[in-house]
Swiss-Prot record:
Record flagged with keyword Signal: yes
Keyword Glycosyltransferase annotated: yes
Enzymatic class: transferase
GO molecular function: UDP-glycosyltransferase activity
Protein name: Ecdysteroid UDP-glucosyltransferase
Entry keyword set: Glycosyltransferase, Signal, Transferase
Function: Catalyzes the transfer of glucose from UDP-glucose to ecdysteroids which are insect molting hormones. Expression of egt interferes with normal insect development and block molting.
Any coiled-coil regions, as ranges: none
Sequence similarity: Belongs to the UDP-glycosyltransferase family.
EC number of the protein: 2.4.1.-
Species whose genome carries this gene: Orgyia pseudotsugata multicapsid polyhedrosis virus
Signal peptide: 1-17
Gene that this sequence comes from: EGT
Amino acid sequence: MVFLIIALTLLATGARAASILAVLPTPAYSHHVVYRAYVHALVKNCHNVTVIKPQLLDYAVQDECGRVEQIDADMSAQQYKKLVASSGVFRKRGVVADETTVTADNYMGLIEMFKDQFDNANVRRFLSTNRTFDAVVVEAFADYALVFGHLFRPAPVIQIAPGYGLAENFERRRAVARHPLHYPTFGAAALTRRGGALSEWRLLNEFELLARRSDELLKQQFGKSTPTIRQLRDNVQLLLLNLHPVYDNNRPVPPSVQYLGGGLHLAQALPQRLDAPLERRLNESVDGAVYVSFGSGIDTNSIHAEFLQMLLDTFANLNNYTVLWKVDDAVAASVALPRNVLAQKWFSQTAVLRHKNVVAFVTQAGLQSSDEALQARVPMVCLPMMGDQFHHARKLQQFGVARALDTAAVSAPQLQLAIREVIADGEAYRARIDKLRAVVEHDAAPDEKAVKFTERVIKFNNDVNWPARSLKTTAANMAYSDYFVRFPL
């Protein structure tokens, strides 16, 4: 009976079961909730997916016509946090990364982490099996992992990002990139846009240097004949981005770049429930509750004492509200918590945000967190700390659904004022949230769109001599010197 159902499903969709390799090495929870949803959507459509990933989230599925095989690359999220903290990426107040920290030296630790993961015995054993795949999916932040497109050629390569793409992702597709005002590199947006073109030029040079150093490691690890990062990028046929283009300033892109609309991790998510004591406390918070979380990628143990005290002073002055604070146990135990604060190392975030008495969300402006807040109609106060969070916080403020503050300089009175403002104007904020949700409402579910374009790449991959098969532009992965200088006279 099961085989009959599978056969009928494939017949109805007109698809064939594909064998897909997904290489997803970054041990970041906010990344993997998106990647897992994508993998589950592929499996639901009867494809078989082998995932190389760290021990973080379980990708196993049951009762689907496809299957998931997990290859443990064994790199814990805690190791990742320590590596990032020790790399010098975070400078201000212990948790805020400004543009000056985006250097090849600081990012080499991440590249070496990828190298160590791919040297893992489980991964080496997998590579020795000489299996074949119909497609290789690689996370867009990990160009080093593009080597799997070479190892399993001629399978086409697809990149996926949990949110915004990097400038390198766009320029290799020959989409618009590196405009200091309209389409800045995420690092250049970290402060106040000072420096403009000079910042973009510096970041371009830093990432070119990082690519050259990655080339050296790739040849050490996989042999002298291993292609360079630039050459490996040429194998990428499709870039999937888990956000709506309105957040990316409606960037002009070719068909090889697909915005999924955002909320991919929410597409098939089951409703979460609060535990009874927490639900009771929120029910009793008649004036409202404020939820404070800086996401899974920030090690709250690294918060400097001055910033920590600023937060505590803010919470104490919000004494008519319950404050739910996601923070490591060691931090909570080291301070005197105000009586209105409940500190825990983990909350069921979607369930908390959906409670009727939660009136504001203090967030680092991570894309997944903001998607959840918008779904729950909760206004935000953004304290961005790294990467694309600075740009995203500004966009949320521009759309009128959040207040964005300078995390490196904000004081307790300023933070308290912002929180009280979004609470006092809650109805206006929720009305604008409803308008924004209507704008970004999906024409197609993000998981369905991701599967559709993945299947398209696989379907036409064998027609290598047919120009119409590709979603890429004719200028894809062309060096700027060739793109702007070489043309027929």
